[in-house]
């Protein structure tokens, strides 16, 4: 018996097992009655780690899923193999059931966040070289902050970000003046190096970075000495939520009218922080041809949770007047497995990456 079962009194435990059984065969009305009696919809059995929602998903009965979700079933509960009920629907080709679970996730997760950026900024980082010879940064707990694997992997993710942000932009054409770039979160500097390798080079390149050791690394590598590069020390909130400082940030852009491309990837900030960043984009992105993208890694260890996070981001970008176009990037399994050796916490475990490119909506 697991810890959740041990903390249920006998009457609730009986109701929990009745609900589990009913979810496999009974009509939606029976499920509703059990929930009305107080059956715990969050309960998961010992054998498979399945909840009532998992069993209902196996039946391909949309109404059962709706009743259970309305009764408190947890949309993102995972079984012993890390699968949500959404993955059960996907494996059975049940698009309707999967959409019901995904949409519930979007509704319920609107106010969630993860990580603690302020704690991270005070933590000690370690620069390490993996067996592949690539440099990586680990935090004090051994979590990957910025991995050297992103360099080989960049040809299917990071390079793709830069490509999508710059391709066919009028200022990125040969002979043009170059784009005005803002990158928030330096890491190992891979994205910034790729921007610098563009032809023409950026006419202006601002980097916002807050971690003291990363700032030391920037100066050690001489990034601050590159032509047209400006380093702003501090959190993006310090610069972009301060009315006076926003003017300073925009001072390097043509006529102060906004950046041509903005990319953000800040480790240990949760979705609430990303959503707050969305809200300042209309003030700092060039309205005519500006493009915005972000590292889309929230929930990236589970396909259903990842889909919910991506859909939620799209909705919130639309709320502030941006339209999003998604680009799917394939990640080879061999590469996904190799890069996590020696790292405690994975933050990517999916075969594909959804790359967002957002532009101001045309009115």
From Swiss-Prot:
The keyword Nucleus applies. Keywords: ANK repeat, Cytoplasm, Methyltransferase, Nucleus, Repeat, S-adenosyl-L-methionine, Transferase. It holds the Pfam family Ank_2. Its main location: cytoplasm. S-adenosyl-L-methionine binds at residues 120, 186-191, 209-211, 236-237, 265. One of its GO terms (biological process) is methylation. Its EC number is 2.1.1.-. ANK repeats lie at residues 22-46, 48-80. GO terms for cellular component: cytoplasm; nucleus. The keyword Nucleus applies. It is an enzyme of class 2 (transferase). Residues 111-363 form the RMT2 domain. S-adenosyl-L-methionine-dependent protein-arginine N-methyltransferase that methylates the delta-nitrogen atom of arginine residues to form N5-methylarginine (type IV) in target proteins. Monomethylates ribosomal protein L12. Belongs to the class I-like SAM-binding methyltransferase superfamily. RMT2 methyltransferase family. This is Protein arginine N-methyltransferase 2. The lineage of its organism: Eukaryota, Fungi, Dikarya, Basidiomycota, Agaricomycotina. The gene is RMT2.
């Amino acid at each position: 018996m697991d810890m959740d079962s041990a903390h249920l009194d006998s009457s609730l435990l009986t109701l929990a097992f009745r609900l589990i059984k009913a979810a496999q065969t009974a009509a939606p009305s029976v499920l509703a009655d059990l929930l009305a009696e107080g059956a715990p919809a969050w309960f998961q059995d010992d054998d498979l780690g399945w909840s009532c929602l998992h069993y209902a998903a196996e039946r391909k009965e949309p109404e059962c899923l709706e009743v259970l979700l309305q009764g408190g079933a947890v949309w993102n509960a995972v079984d012993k193999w890390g699968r949500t009920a959404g993955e059960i629907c996907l494996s059975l080709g049940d698009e309707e059931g999967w959409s019901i679970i995904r949409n519930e996730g979007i509704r319920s997760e609107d106010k969630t966040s993860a990580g603690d950026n302020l704690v991270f900024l005070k933590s000690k980082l370690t620069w390490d070289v993996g067996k592949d010879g690539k440099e990586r940064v680990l935090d004090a707990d051994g979590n990957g902050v910025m991995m050297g694997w992103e360099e080989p992997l960049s040809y299917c993710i990071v390079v793709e970000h830069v490509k999508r942000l710059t391709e066919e932009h009028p200022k990125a054409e040969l002979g043009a003046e170059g784009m005005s770039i803002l990158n928030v979160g330096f890491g190992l500097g891979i994205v910034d190096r790729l921007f610098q390798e563009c032809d023409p080079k950026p006419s202006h390149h601002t980097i916002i970075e807050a971690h003291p050791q990363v700032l030391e690394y920037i100066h050690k590598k001489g990034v601050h000495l590159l032509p047209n590069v400006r380093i702003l020390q501090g959190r993006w909130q310090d610069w972009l939520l301060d009315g006076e400082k926003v003017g300073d940030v925009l001072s390097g852009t043509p006529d102060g009218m906004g950046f041509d491309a903005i990319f953000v990837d800040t480790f240990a900030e949760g979705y609430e922080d990303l959503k707050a960043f969305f809200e300042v984009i209309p003030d700092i992105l060039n309205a005519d041809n500006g493009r915005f993208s972000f590292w889309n890694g929230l929930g990236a260890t589970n396909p259903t949770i990842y889909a919910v996070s991506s859909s939620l981001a799209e909705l919130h970008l639309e709320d502030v007047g941006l339209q999003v176009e998604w680009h799917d990037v394939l990640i080879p399994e061999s590469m996904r497995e190799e890069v996590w050796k020696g790292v405690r916490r994975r933050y990517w475990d999916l075969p594909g990456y959804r790359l967002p490119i957002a532009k101001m909506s045309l009115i």
